[in-house]
Amino acid sequence: MSRRHSAEKREINPDPKFGDLIVTKFMNAVMYDGKKSVAETIVYGALDQVQSKTKQEPVTVFHQALDNVAPHVEVRSRRVGGATYQVPVDVRPERRQALAIRWLIAAARNRNETTMIDRLSGELMDAANNRGTAVKKREDTHKMAEANRAFAHYRW
């Protein structure tokens, strides 16, 4: 990481099917080894499954799931006089989105369904309904921040 200047943000084109930037970011996070067509198949397949099961617009369910998973506060380690404190800090909007995407995909990959499309659609529907592993991860993060509220004055 350069100390002179921060890296410039790359421009991302919205996905062709829904015209949504966040779906593209999600697709890029699902992608392994540069295989974008495989990632597209997985994400679009999962969103089609969500639409057929919930009878709702898949992108709205997707955004609802992301909102339900995105953390508002997290803890960061801060060393003060030989002791390390877990200090609660607010999460920036870009990081909130990145964490939500990361946690949703990790939770989907750990599910027991046979195909990734089934796992991802199941996790998206669970997250949209405030259930599932990704939502539990957010709740745990919030609990950690709440438990360490006494150290909030160490914020930097």
UniProtKB/Swiss-Prot annotation:
| UniProt xrefs under Pfam families | Ribosomal_S7
Q: Which InterPro entries match?
A: Ribosomal_uS7 (IPR000235), Ribosomal_uS7_bac/org-type (IPR005717), Ribosomal_uS7_CS (IPR020606), Ribosomal_uS7_dom (IPR023798), Ribosomal_uS7_dom_sf (IPR036823)
Spell out the GO cellular component terms annotated for this protein, sorted alphabetically and separated by semicolons. small ribosomal subunit
Its Gene Ontology biological processes? translation
Keywords linked to the UniProt accession:
Ribonucleoprotein, Ribosomal protein, RNA-binding, rRNA-binding, tRNA-binding
> What molecular function terms (GO) are annotated for this protein?
rRNA binding; structural constituent of ribosome; tRNA binding
Family recorded in the similarity comment: Belongs to the universal ribosomal protein uS7 family.
Query: What is its biological role?
Result: One of the primary rRNA binding proteins, it binds directly to 16S rRNA where it nucleates assembly of the head domain of the 30S subunit. Is located at the subunit interface close to the decoding center, probably blocks exit of the E-site tRNA.
- Subunit: Part of the 30S ribosomal subunit. Contacts proteins S9 and S11.
Q: What is this protein called?
A: Small ribosomal subunit protein uS7
